[in-house]
Swiss-Prot record:
Topological domain ranges for the Cytoplasmic compartment: 891-898, 949-969, 1033-1053, 1102-1485
Description of activity control: Receptor activity is regulated by proteolytic processing. The long N-terminal has a an inhibitory effect on the constitutive signaling activity. Removal of the N-terminal region induces an increase of the receptor activity.
GO molecular function, one term: G protein-coupled receptor activity
Residues making up the signal peptide according to the UniProt record: 1-20
Cleavage, annotated site positions: 284-285, 844-845
Ranges of residues in domain GAIN-B: 690-857
UniProt topology in membrane: Multi-pass membrane protein
GO cellular component: extracellular region; plasma membrane
Residue stretches of biased makeup (Low complexity): 702-713
Descriptive protein name: Adhesion G protein-coupled receptor B2
């Protein structure tokens, strides 16, 4: 037994411990933190109502915050639970609040003997809340934690207590900031004090820094002395109402942020007298020394979360609720619904079939007594045939009949009509009556017991009267009938609900209206509002003011993005109102940057781009009116911080604000606004005609004590007392101005000029509209209204073409009027001009001009371009398309650099016209309008650049430096690259700001962006004029262009530029004016005229009047020019164009260039140059001419087989070896022409491949005969030189524009001295002999070779003729491959360099100059033919040929290697300058 005792003892102890340990304390112990104010019941505080349960409240910072508790005595709670409070420095989670048992109390008393009194006070810190006899107990604690305990044993309490007792709010908690008490917390304390006074029959008071409550003069305040806690318990500022107390002075102690103090008051003590200081509590306007109670209006709390949808499929509904904080001290109750419901669309219900309407109930089964009746319904299956409906087919119900009476039956009363069977297209309603009795024979009542009538006679909407399903902005809008409003969730980046109405057009077709986002708030703006509330919760004023600065900065950044909804604008107005109120309450002076940001935010909000958003937001709340009030309050907040005679000017893009402070006693001068000459003023203000003149007589108070209702607040309904400032709309608290006697000694005068506010304010009654800018004038304190109107206002129009203008002012007393809030009785219209209207008003307010808009305004808002713009663009486009079609049809014949430039120019004009029409549509989005403006800027500039490109092309053609491939790339860079560069730089610097506005899709007239178009256009016009002057001087110069075709082309380009460029400038200038001022019919008509004329002029100049196009059209029609030979590249034969190969064209161009080449040019203009140019790559630069040292010859390589004669020359007097002289070719208009130099041909055939290179720059073609060129004696020719043989008539008429060569001789030119003959022989060239055929007179023009040779011999093909013409030069091989060209080019260069070296060695010993002179004019070419077949030379001619061949062989082949005189062709005409001009004449021998 002894071993069992310890075991039993351990079991008992375990049970005891198990009973003592209760895990419930964690369930009935709660800790609350962050509670500012609340009233709680037992159910709220204690989830488990048991003894020892506790609820602990945490004070976040006892040094800054004070914790007040009010205990509302409830007898049942006190009797069953005995609640008490314990102030704690530390929170213990498992601390129990049970009272100790009597035995434990004795033990604790014995153990605590000898402890100090402080520890005893700590141990006895529990405060019995029910010890007092009064209904209230007020407690104030400065501890970290306050714990509420249930100390009694409520064994039967939960069951005995009534539900009302459990729900009774017996504890109220209030947390107050000692440094900055808010109006709400002070209002709660005042309410407690009033309730205490009413319950005790006297006034109760306690001290709290920063709070004061109204009381009656002479009343007393007493602290409660009822039985309560022991004297050891100190309750700071505590008031426990109870038993009698000695009377005391009734004064509520107050404090301020500059004079803070706290009083410790024990039970039975009286509060000390405190001085009166300035507070933030309102005071009576009639009795300044008496404090008034703060009026607290009811405020809605945040909406709760939406409930689940009422249906799991199909369409149901969702709801949410919100609670209202009750009003106090006569405040207004909360306005608006407490419950909000919306539709919800779930997934379609999985029903295969659909039941139709129930049929009517059948008759009752019995005529009397109880019975049953049935009804049935049908299943409508739209799917497969096997689908069925789920549910019962029939329905049965009981029918109660009366007992079968023994007497005759009768009908009972009719019941109510049933619901209509259809909602549209005529349904049916039924009602029934019962037969109350039957006859003795059991027969029913006579008559019918059912009655039917039609209902819902309105027709169902047709298919075209239903708006279809649409997916817009990530939202799906279900189909709806016309007139219905559909609600949907906001886009993912916002919260709230969006709505959209299905409208009906004038043609009876339903369409969706614009979605309404007035109830959508972006997440960024909601986060900013939460940040604002966090700053408001801060106790310190300085922190709250700095927080408001951060809020304004963040709001400016959000609005600068310009991506917000209409609901965000209303939310921003509310944020600005809270910021202004916080600045007032905290007495925080905003910095200059804060003021600038604030008004910049307002400028963003009232921008004209937000007109549609404001129209949408006005359907929910008059946000623009609220914004107007907030701006006025902020102006006076800034003005109060200014010094006397100090002013402030803030300028933004959409409003200008002037704030100044003037003393009441002496206003310095009259006030004029705005001051346009101030630095930093915007252009729209500087150039506007808006003006305000406020005479200083208006600025006078009505009386020293009570100013009159005037100023911006002086409109009807806006009068306030001298110590208050009217709050903005929706304010729940008013700003309290300090009771400073100097406050009313200064005027704060504010003036605001709004650029676009008239577009967003509620419109006046139709048909009027706000036609001018809006100006606001506000003065505080309010002034005495003058007896007669003295305020002069001039307002400029923002809508042109208006009629019947009226001056009006905004009436704040009718802010809720639906018809508008403009009042025309306050102002008088003095003068109306074309640009502005002058008004004279009596009261200070917000002013504007109301007028009737023009009739075409409705057409403009429809979104279609005006008729003149459409006509002008259409005519211009049709003309240009005609030009493009003609060029496309004959492109192979008119292809040139000028044609390519013209096509690009036409494309730029076509694109500009299309973009002008697109930009006039009002349905474009912001991004599309910006892109339209940028591309319009680009094509406008490109059209100017292509005109400049045409002028540049004509200039290059005039000076002869035209290289096709290289210049074409430069033309493209100038025509398209330069405009693209200008637009890219403009877009990069402005970030597309200014590209497109709310009124037009073009460059904005503000900010200087328009200079990005005007500047380059002006520079292009100036450069074009300079080039035109240069080209004109070149054409008119005596030594100008000799080539008639070049001269004609250059003149045509110059004339085109002179005509097209001014017309282009006028067209685009009128286009800019027509786009920016869409209501001006004059500008639109001018643009239509200029644009149409531009298209016709371009088509006429470059198509109908262009020679190439005329020739092509004539040849296509079979009418060709008869004066051109068929060898010409532009000639026709039998109505068909003669197509030349590329190589032939290059050869012909080279030959023509030789004849009409300018001085000092260095282009490949001969056959050799053509070959060298063809042998180069496309991107390779052509080589320059071979220029030797000064005084040396310049040779160019020639095509063909070059064999340098290396054989020794025969001796003197010996005949040279027989050889055949190669033909000589000269360049003519039609190509190469072979010269028949019979005096150079030996009798024997020569070897192939020998050439004689004649130097350039010395060829002289002069008419023969006496006195040619002014010389007395004809030039001699070497002895033995053969005379020219006469030509037949057939040969002389075969070539156009060439003179026949009557004589050709070699003579000694005086420019190079005499030739030093090493053999000592003297050569005397014989005098020239006139031709046997003819001798042309000086100055006579002879056409011996016509261009067109009729006859069958000239009917061969063009290609055969070209081959025959170039057969001697072996061009057939050259035309085969490009590689052959390159080989010939490099081979000729190498051989001629060797030949030049031989010539340079013999130049020093030769002093004579050989020249070849020929008859004919200086500007004509020499062409000769071969001798007629069968004609044999005479003996004398043969001897001359031998002597000449001997001389040639001796001089060119057998001279020693010494420096020789260069062999040149010399212009021997006496009328030519001494210094020979540069040329490029080359002849092949």
């Amino acid at each position: 037994m002894t071993p069992a005792c310890p075991l039993l003892l351990s079991v008992i102890l375990s049970l005891r411990l198990a009973a003592a340990f209760d895990p419930a304390p964690s369930a009935c112990s709660a800790l609350a933190s962050g509670v500012l104010y609340g009233a709680f019941s037992l159910q709220d505080l204690f989830p488990t109502i048991a003894s020892g349960c506790s609820w602990t409240l945490e004070n976040p910072d006892p040094t800054k915050y004070s914790l007040y508790l009010r205990f509302n005595r409830q007898e049942q709670v006190c009797a069953h639970f005995a609640p008490r409070l314990l102030p704690l420095d530390h929170y213990l989670v498992n601390f129990t609040c049970l009272r100790p048992s009597p035995e434990e109390a004795v033990t604790q008393a014995e153990s605590e003997v000898g402890r100090p009194e402080e520890e005893e006070a700590e141990a006895a810190a529990g405060l019995e809340l029910c010890s007092g006899a009064g209904p209230f107990t007020f407690l104030h604690f400065d501890k970290n934690f306050v714990q509420l305990c249930l100390s009694a044993e409520p064994s039967e309490a939960p069951r005995l207590l009534a539900p009302a007792a459990l729900a009774f709010r017996f504890v109220e908690v209030l947390l107050i900031n000692n440094n900055n008490s808010s109006q709400f917390t002070c209002g709660v304390l005042c309410r407690w004090s009033e309730e205490c006074g009413r319950a005790a029959g006297r006034a109760c008071g306690f001290a709290q820094p920063g709070c004061s409550c109204p009381g009656e003069a002479g009343a007393g305040s007493a602290t409660t002395t009822s039985p309560g806690p022991p004297a050891a318990h100190t309750l700071s500022n505590a008031l426990v109402p109870g038993g009698p107390a000695p009377p005391a002075e009734a004064d509520l102690h107050s404090g301020s942020s500059n004079d803070l103090f706290t009083t410790e008051m024990r039970y039975g003590e009286e509060p000390e007298e405190e001085p009166k200081v300035k507070t933030q509590w309102p005071r009576s306007a009639d009795e300044p020394g008496l404090y008034m109670a703060q009026t607290v209006h009811g405020v809605w709390e945040e909406w709760g979360s939406w409930s689940l949808c009422s249906r799991s499929c199909g369409r149901g509904s969702r709801s949410r609720m919100r609670t209202c904080v009750p009003p106090q001290h006569g405040g207004k109750a909360c306005e608006g619904p407490e419950l909000q419901t919306k539709l919800c669309s779930m997934a379609a219900c999985p029903v295969e079939g659909q039941w139709l309407e129930w049929g009517p109930w059948g008759p009752c089964s019995t005529s009397c007594a109880n019975g049953t009746q049935q009804r049935s319904r049908k299943c409508s299956v739209a799917g497969p045939a096997w689908a069925t409906c789920t549910g019962a087919l029939t329905d049965t119900r009981e029918c109660s009949n009366l007992e079968c009476p023994a007497t005759d039956s009768k009908w009972g009363p009719w019941n109510a009509w049933s619901l209509c069977s259809k909602t549209c297209d005529t349904g049916w309603q039924r009602r029934f009556r019962m037969c109350q009795a039957t006859g003795t024979q059991g027969y029913p009542c006579e008559g019918t017991g059912e009655e039917v009538k039609p209902c819902s006679e309105k027709r169902c909407p047709a298919f075209h009267e239903m708006c279809r399903d649409e997916y817009v902005m990530l939202m799906t809008w279900k189909k709806a009938a016309a007139g219905e409003i559909i609600y949907n969730k906001c886009p993912p980046n916002a919260s709230g609900s969006a709505s959209r109405r299905c409208l009906l057009s004038a043609q009876g077709v339903a369409y969706w209206g614009l979605p309404s986002f007035a109830r959508c708030i972006s997440h960024e703006y909601r986060y900013l509002y939460l940040s604002l509330r966090e700053h408001l919760a801060k106790g310190q004023r300085m922190l709250a003011g700095e927080g408001m600065s951060q809020v304004v900065r963040s709001l400016q950044e959000l609005l600068a993005r310009r991506t917000y909804y209409s609901g965000d604008l209303l939310f921003s107005v509310d944020i600005l109102r809270n910021v202004t109120d916080t600045f007032k309450r905290a007495t925080y002076v905003p910095s200059a940057d804060d003021v600038q940001r604030f008004f910049q935010v307002v400028s963003f909000m009232v921008d004209a781009e937000n007109k549609e958003k404001w129209d949408d937001a006005q359907q929910v709340s008059p946000g623009s009116v609220h914004l107007l009030r907030v701006v006025e309050d902020f102006i006076h907040l800034v003005g109060d911080a200014l010094k006397a005679f100090q002013s402030s000017l803030i300028v933004t893009d959409n409003l200008v604000i002037s704030i100044q402070r003037e003393p009441v006693s002496a206003v310095s001068s009259d006030i004029t606004f705005p001051m346009r000459g101030r630095r930093g003023m915007k252009d729209w203000v500087r150039h506007s005609e808006d003006r305000l003149f406020l005479p200083k007589e208006v600025l006078s108070l009505s009386s020293p004590g009570k100013p009159a209702t005037s100023g911006a607040a002086g409109s009807p309904g806006r009068g306030r007392g001298p110590g208050t400032v009217p709050p903005g709309p929706g304010h729940s608290h008013q700003r309290l101005l300090p009771a400073d006697p100097d406050e009313s000694s200064y005027f704060v005068i504010g003036a605001v000029l709004y650029r676009t506010l008239g577009l967003i304010l509620p419109p006046p009654r139709p048909p009027l509209a706000v036609a001018s800018r809006v100006m606001t004038v506000t003065v505080r304190p309010p002034t005495q209204p003058p007896a007669e109107p003295l305020i002069t206002v001039e307002l400029s129009y923002i809508i042109n073409g208006t009629t019947d203008p009226h001056c009006a002012s905004w009436d704040y007393s009718r802010a809720d009027a639906s018809s508008g809030d403009w009042d025309t009785e306050n102002c008088q219209t003095l003068e109306t001009q074309a640009a502005h209207t002058r008004c004279q008003c009596q009261h200070l307010s917000t002013f504007a001009v109301l007028a009737q808009p023009p009739k075409d305004l409705t057409l403009e808002l429809a979104g279609s371009p005006s008729v003149p713009l459409v006509i002008g663009c259409a005519v211009s486009c049709m003309a240009l398309l005609t030009l493009l079609a003609i060029y496309a049809a004959f492109w192979r014949f008119v292809k040139s650099e000028r044609s390519i430039i013209l096509l690009n120019f036409c494309l730029s004009i076509l694109a500009s016209n299309i973009l002008i029409l697109v930009g006039q549509s009002r349905v474009l989005s912001k991004g599309v309008c910006t892109m339209t403006a940028a591309f319009l800027h680009f094509f406008f500039l490109s059209s100017f650049c292509w005109v400049l490109t045409e002028a540049w092309q004509s200039y290059l053609a005039v000076i002869g430096r035209m290289r096709t491939r290289l210049v074409r790339k430069r033309f493209l860079c100038l025509g398209w690259g330069l405009p693209a560069l200008v637009v890219a730089v403009s877009v990069g610097f402005t970030r597309t700001k200014g590209y497109g506005t709310s009124s037009y899709c073009w460059l904005s007239l503000e900010g200087g962006l328009l200079y990005a178009f005007v500047g380059p256009a002006a520079v292009i016009v100036l450069v074009n004029m300079l080039i035109g002057i240069i080209v004109f001087n070149k054409l008119m110069a005596r030594d100008g262009i000799s080539d008639k075709s070049k001269k004609q082309r250059a003149g045509a380009s110059l004339w085109s530029s002179c005509v097209v460029l001014p017309l282009l400038a006028l067209t685009w200038m009128s286009a800019v004016l027509a786009m920016t001022d869409r209501r001006s019919v004059l500008f639109q008509a001018l643009f239509a005229v200029f644009n149409s004329a531009q298209g016709f002029v371009i088509t006429a100049v470059h198509c109908f009047l262009r020679r190439e196009v005329q020739d092509v059209v004539k040849c296509q029609m079979g009418v060709c020019r008869a004066d051109e030979s068929e060898d010409s590249p532009d000639s026709c034969k039998n109505g068909q164009l003669q197509i030349l190969s590329d190589f032939e064209k290059d050869v012909d161009l080279a030959c023509q260039t030789v004849l009409f080449k300018e001085v000092n040019t260095c282009n490949p203009s001969t056959i050799t140059g053509t070959l060298s140019r063809l042998s180069l790559d496309e991107d390779e630069e052509p080589k320059s001419c071979l220029v030797g040292p000064e005084g040396s010859l310049s040779f160019s390589p020639l095509p063909g087989n070059i064999l340098v004669p290396m054989a020794a020359s025969p001796g003197l007097g010996e005949p040279p070896p027989p050889q055949e002289a190669n033909p000589v070719y000269m360049c003519g208009e039609g190509g190469l022409r072979q010269l028949d130099l019979t005096w150079l041909r030996p009798t024997e055939p020569g070897s192939e491949g020998d050439y004689m290179v004649l130097p350039r720059r010395t060829l002289s073609l002069q008419p023969g005969g006496g006195g040619g060129g002014g010389e007395d004696a004809p030039r001699a020719r070497p002895e033995g030189t053969p005379r020219r043989a006469a030509k037949t008539v057939a040969h002389t008429e075969g070539y156009p524009s060439f003179l026949s060569v009557d004589h050709s001789g070699l003579g000694l030119g005086p420019a190079y001295g005499s030739l030093q003959n090493p053999y000592g022989m003297t050569f005397q060239p014989p005098p020239p002999t006139p031709s046997a055929r003819q001798v042309p007179e000086p100055g006579e023009r002879s056409r011996t070779m016509p261009r067109t040779v009729p006859g069958s011999t000239m009917k061969m093909g063009s290609l055969e003729r070209k081959k025959l013409r170039y057969s001697d030069l072996d061009f057939e091989k050259v035309m085969h491959t490009r590689k052959r060209h390159s080989e010939l080019y490099h081979e000729l260069n190498q051989k001629f360099h060797t030949f030049d070296r031989y010539r340079s060695q013999s130049t020093a010993k030769r002093e004579k100059r050989w020249s070849v002179s020929s008859g004919g004019a200086a500007e004509r070419s020499v062409c000769a033919d071969k001798p007629s077949p069968g004609e044999r030379p005479s003996l004398s001619q043969h001897r001359r040929h031998q002597s000449w061949s001997t001389f040639k062989s001796m001089t060119l082949g057998s001279l020693p290697p010494k420096p020789r005189e260069r062999l040149t062709l010399h212009r021997a005409a006496a009328w030519e300058p001494t210094e020979p001009p540069d040329g490029d004449f080359q002849t092949e021998v």
